[in-house]
Amino acid sequence: MRTSQYLLSTLKETPADAEVISHQLMLRAGMIRKLASGLYTWLPTGVRVLKKVENIVREEMNNAGAIEVSMPVVQPADLWQESGRWEQYGPELLRFVDRGERPFVLGPTHEEVITDLIRNELSSYKQLPLNFYQIQTKFRDEVRPRFGVMRSREFLMKDAYSFHTSQESLQETYDAMYAAYSKIFSRMGLDFRAVQADTGSIGGSASHEFQVLAQSGEDDVVFSDTSDYAANIELAEAIAPKEPRAAATQEMTLVDTPNAKTIAELVEQFNLPIEKTVKTLLVKAVEGSSFPLVALLVRGDHELNEVKAEKLPQVASPLTFATEEEIRAVVKAGPGSLGPVNMPIPVVIDRTVAAMSDFAAGANIDGKHYFGINWDRDVATPEVADIRNVVAGDPSPDGQGTLLIKRGIEVGHIFQLGTKYSEALKASVQGEDGRNQILTMGCYGIGVTRVVAAAIEQNYDERGIVWPDAIAPFQVAILPMNMHKSFRVQELAEKLYSELRAQGIEVLLDDRKERPGVMFADMELIGIPHTIVLGDRNLDNDDIEYKYRRNGEKQLIKTGDIVEYLVKQIKG
């Protein structure tokens, strides 16, 4: 490709509304342009990267035995009503009616559509297992699209769905998809972790996320410093303290704390160790409960894990925190003064709280706290559960090493769905015993557009993007200095361009009438891995300057050796 026949569209300045580095660099490198909130046009450079990602995904899915299909973006509402997700999915599901007043949705995912297809196409266990995938546009009406294509409303996704007659068969495909995803992200040159995860609104039993490690990530990824254990922080188990609860050394005392409405204020004003404080959070109880609210207690320096809390049988789903009005109606005190003593509603405490003694907590009286609280002396030990987020340094749940926490960007997710959708949509086949058998399902997603942004978040420097070779828009940039004034430079540039293309190498020849500084800046911004610079001074010695984008190293290579050298660098 020649720049004179290409839409380069690079920008010198960073757009003001671009928050994260991937959004900034995708705009500056001429990869995308914003059409509306959460909607982007992909320009030629962006499309080239996108296609590289797609091709790797497609190759590995095919290698794993999956079969490619294509399903409509527009889906009839009755399928979503049949599955029960019409009400469950919420406002992210874009709903509309056609001219015949028939309701439809823009598909955020395709469990309903594929299950409907399979219930009409398959009849016997002999046709299974099967695994179908597509790479297709999805739409989720995000309330606040942000971070460019990282959290956009329209995006490209690879979604796959497998069908089985046994859990054992599902496990085999699940393991194959786990391995395929690992190959996909390894081929792309990404530093990633596969972590245990919550199944969320998709449902099902087992689940793993594939997280690209990056400081800008929205998720906390937890992993052991010794073993292979890794999990999303939502799912990581916080192990109970090994040490037995210390004996009480203080009497419980009611203390006036009118200006301490938060743990931080309590600690500062009374010089308390934060590890000796407890915070109390009130959430709505499950419908039909004899109490409207449930009290959840975690140590002052810990955070409530909302996913774990929502799974408590007495807690309403989705988890909803009580308003001050609702709290006062039940406890007669405000949010800054709550604690376990004389709490008139059910209480669940974290494992760490259960091991505490001589601790401080609200007295359920405005402006007052109890100091020196001890379980079973001042208040009965309530139900104990794991309801907090782990922190760095906690013991690993597998008993090996301690936990580290890094930020991650979720780029893939695999689920064992079980029979959630097949039961709802009555998808079954005749089993080996001749009886009707509901199908067992798995689903497997990769955010293709998100992978592009995640790769940038992990691969950039002060000059621009530093693409891993496998997904770079071009493999080689040819920069001929003053080619429009030097016939020798122009002739060699054309010769190398032809020879490299003949070797199957993707080349961008910068044949613009631009200053060398502009040419260098653009190629580094775009992130092309290999650059060769042709100039009269070096050609006098039969040399060409070669530069590797990732480490910035330069070397002079003889003109007659450059093609062979590049082929070896790129193809090995």
Swiss-Prot record:
Catalytic activity of the protein: tRNA(Pro) + L-proline + ATP = L-prolyl-tRNA(Pro) + AMP + diphosphate
One CC-aspect GO term: cytosol
Stored InterPro entries: aa-tRNA-synt_IIb, aa-tRNA-synth_II, aa-tRNA-synth_II/BPL/LPL, Anticodon-bd, Anticodon-bd_dom_sf, Pro-tRNA-ligase_IIa, Pro-tRNA-synth_IIa_bac-type, Pro-tRNA-Synthase_IIa_type1
GO MF term (any one): ATP binding
Entry keywords, A to Z: Aminoacyl-tRNA synthetase, ATP-binding, Cytoplasm, Ligase, Nucleotide-binding, Protein biosynthesis
Organismal lineage: Bacteria, Pseudomonadati, Pseudomonadota, Gammaproteobacteria, Enterobacterales
Function: Catalyzes the attachment of proline to tRNA(Pro) in a two-step reaction: proline is first activated by ATP to form Pro-AMP and then transferred to the acceptor end of tRNA(Pro). As ProRS can inadvertently accommodate and process non-cognate amino acids such as alanine and cysteine, to avoid such errors it has two additional distinct editing activities against alanine. One activity is designated as 'pretransfer' editing and involves the tRNA(Pro)-independent hydrolysis of activated Ala-AMP.
Cellular localization per UniProt: Cytoplasm
GO biological process: prolyl-tRNA aminoacylation
Official protein name in the record: Proline--tRNA ligase
Cystine residue pairs: none
Subunit structure and binding partners: Homodimer.
